[in-house]
Curated annotation (Swiss-Prot):
Coiled coil region boundaries: 18-82
Organism the protein comes from: Dictyostelium discoideum
GO cellular component: membrane
Record family assignment: Belongs to the small heat shock protein (HSP20) family.
Region feature (Disordered): 432-478
Protein known as: Heat shock protein DDB_G0283913
Transmembrane in keyword set: yes
Lineage: Eukaryota, Amoebozoa, Evosea, Eumycetozoa, Dictyostelia
Domain (sHSP) ranges: 551-667
Amino acid sequence: MFVGTLVIIICTTLIIIIKKILKRKKEKLNLKESKKKKQDNERKNFEGLLTKKRVEVGDLKKEIEKLNKDKIELAKKLNCYIGDSSIPANGIREYDIIIDIPSVDYLSQSRKSWIIYVSNQLKQKMGSSNYNKKRPLHSLLKEYKKFSTLACLGVLNKGKTFFINKYNGTYLPSGTQAQTIGLSLSISSLNETITIDTAGSNTALQVCEDKTEEHLARKESTEMFICDMSFSLASIIVYVLNELTWNDQRFILALQSKIQSLRSESNIIKKLLVVHNYPKVNSQEELLSEIKTYIESPFNGNFHHHHVDIKKIESKEEIVLFFVESVNKTHHFFLCNDNSEFGKRYNQLTIEKIRTYKNYNDNLDLDKVLLTSLQNNMIPYCKSPKKLKITEHEPTINQINNNNSSNNKSQLEERPIADSLFQTQSFLHPSIDDTIQDNDKSGSEVSTPTISSSSSSPLQPIIKDEKDDNIENKSDEANTSLKYKPLFTSFGTDEYSKHLKELCKLHQMVSPHRSSIKQIPAFTISPEIDCNRENDFKLIANRIEIIGLNMVFSSGFKPFHDIVKVNSDLRYIIEVPQLEMEDIEFETKHLGSQWYLNIKGIKKLRYDSNDQTTVYPSNLTSLCPSQNQRRDGLFEFSLPIPTEYLPIKPAVSLDKGVITFKFEKIG
């Protein structure tokens, strides 16, 4: 009995233990399955999330590609290239030679010179055995047996550099954020051409404290001088413009007249090409509309439209349109939106046609031509420019220190920028941020800022406390606690201070567009004889006359004259003090339906009374600067001759500095 009970108890205990063991195993199995299920769910969720992220990454990549394409297309529309994505690895991105000309009278300053920058490729040639220090530029370009010179002229931001890039296949910086400096030369072995790019006219004048007239005259003279230099150095002149304006027409007329004079007087042949750049034209219909608007009508009265033909040139089964003026053979070409399908194809064909115009210069001595052109073209703008020389550049101590401290520093910050000639002033007061911070801390009432008459900018907040007129006697600590009053009624005091503070911080962060020079300074242009610089290279046209709304720059000596009728004679009485007959040239010309008396000459000043042959200061004399120096230099003007007077062989007499031309009445 006892044994049976014991067996039952043992069996029951074993059953309970087995059940517990099975239950635990089941729980473990369930837990394992639960973990596995959870892991499977997590894996599925992760795979789903990964797939979603991959889709998002793919979409982002597509968006980035689209943005890059838009960026490149936008850059092309702006005629400039942004970043490296649109420029081939072997693409030419810099000029070969840059002649930096801050101002035409820059050499009037002691120890100043124009700097010639060259690319790394040309710089390496300076150490070769063929390099000649006496003819440095000729040595660097000696490998080019023959080449044509092309100058690109035009107003600022009209597409000059864009044209050069298309012409040479280069990627030079262009557009509103890049400005060409001085005379920038690009050498193309493909076209056998040296192209000359310029900064363009109508650029803004920097702020100046005093002598505003002199700064304006200097700006005008420098732009004209650089334009004259480009014209004299080139055999092919390309004038780039957008929609034709009256200023463009006048400039084209001046170029045509100058080219015709050189051809007839000196047998110098130059070719003028006018390139009309239309960045908004996307089709041939739009181009023909532009031609009818800006070519046919404006040139109708001036260039005899019935003699002008639209020529058709077959090139690669495509047609290129261009105008040829029958009177002076000036060719007009057209460029369209390079981003459009039509413009891209049409521009390429137009450039191919323009490349066919060549005027080669064999064995051109660039050093001699450059120096001669510089001196001759300075004559209308400077008092008595002397001979110039080209020497190797010797960096100053400051430039060496700057190069050692920062190799990536822009050359523009190291080069002199017309030191005392052009001066800029700050946009905001240097302590404005500190003042605003003090206002935020004080939280008190803000007073109205008043702008001082000596302020360099209308936005420069020179603040004056209304409660104390004698602000100048306060300490610096008191001045830093000056208060602002809102200038805009829509802002509260705190909102205005916060807004102005953010504006000032943003102003400090942004940088203006700069034209940095990455090339290496290699040579300098300076006077051969370094004496009397201030007088020899002094600016002539430093006075301005306002006629209506136009500024007229007076340059050099301008003779006064009277027109007098005596009985049946007509007399032109002209004051020419200190001049002899051999100093004056005159002739009568028939232009259109009118006869003119054309008079030109040069007036030279004499300073040494003991030696009448001394034209400029001798070793015994020195010229002291004065505000009202006597006028000298070249002069030329024309006077109309009425039809009732005989226009040829006038009687001429010179007495006591007055020259008289007498014309007899016909009949």
